[in-house]
Amino acid sequence: MPSFDIVSKVDPQTLDNALNVARKEITTRYDFRDSKTEIDLDKKASIIKVTTENSMRMNAIVDIVITRMAKQGIDAKALDMSKEEYASGPMVKRELPVKNGIDKESCKKIIKIIKDSGSKVTPAQMDDLIRVTGKKIDDLQEIIALLRSKDVGVALQFINMK
């Protein structure tokens, strides 16, 4: 019986590469000349920490990071943009947590979308992934296309197509 898994994971090395390219771009840009800007990645907690001098530069840096992540194949939905920036003296700091895994609410939403589609497939939640099984590979490919067209709120990857 053919099946595939739906996961939401970010490769830490790819994320690190994207941040290195973003750091390099920031050091060469004219509008960031002589600015005290830092981008750090806490690999254990999966948090990107951005520090700079004002909120205008902060927005520009976040845009650069998102652009570089997209060029590396990482979806912008993998970042939790809900945490606001905070100031400490003349510097502005912001933490961007990286989401790994599919939360319960998103799992329910994905399973509901799959069941409402009317395809002859069965989704099953397994910890932080969803396994979808069906009789035909064509049905599974239709489900993948359906989920790519819908906005679920998390970055989805489809792995282990058997």
UniProtKB/Swiss-Prot annotation:
Pfam families: DUF520. One of its GO terms (cellular component) is cytosol. The keyword Nucleotide-binding applies. The keyword Nucleotide-binding applies. InterPro entries: DUF520, UPF0234-like_C, UPF0234_N, YajQ-like_sf. Keywords: Nucleotide-binding. GO terms for molecular function: nucleotide binding. Signal peptide: none annotated. HAMAP family: YajQ. Nucleotide-binding protein. Belongs to the YajQ family. NCBIfam families: PRK05412.1 (NF003819). This is Nucleotide-binding protein CHU_2278. It comes from Cytophaga hutchinsonii (strain ATCC 33406 / DSM 1761 / CIP 103989 / NBRC 15051 / NCIMB 9469 / D465).
